[in-house]
């Protein structure tokens, strides 16, 4: 087994059974770097699934705080977190879901001024 230990690989057993993934594919997922822009309605579930699938490096960009109006559709957040920064909470939740994932929060908006510097470290946005 090249790279991933049996214990860690066991977590992904269901997806590594797929001929398209196998162990080599899971190792590629572990090496992947994904930047999620926005941790709201779409970014919230997307980031959960990326962490659950074993994407090794996830960047999160968001400058917003949780509001009551978010709670019915943004599954990363809870009532007690209203007013807190989404990106900080999202990073914490993803790390709790999968401690093998490196999560980097960016508490800002993606703008023309910062996009190049932020995106350069990721394989996909």
Describe each model-derived feature in a short phrase.
Residues 1-125:
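Adenine nucleotide-associated cytosolic modules
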């Amino acid at each position: 087994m090249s790279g991933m230990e049996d214990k860690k690989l066991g977590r992904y057993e269901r997806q590594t059974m797929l001929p398209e993934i196998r162990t080599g594919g899971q190792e590629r997922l572990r090496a992947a770097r994904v930047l999620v822009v926005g941790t709201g309605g779409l970014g919230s579930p997307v980031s959960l699934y990326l962490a659950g699938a074993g994407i090794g490096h996830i960047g999160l960009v968001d400058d917003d705080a949780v509001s009551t109006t978010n709670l019915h559709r943004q599954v990363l957040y809870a009532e007690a977190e209203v007013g807190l920064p989404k990106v900080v909470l999202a990073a914490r939740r993803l790390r709790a879901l999968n401690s093998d994932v490196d999560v980097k929060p960016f508490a800002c908006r993606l703008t023309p001024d910062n996009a190049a510097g932020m995106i350069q470290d990721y394989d996909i946005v």
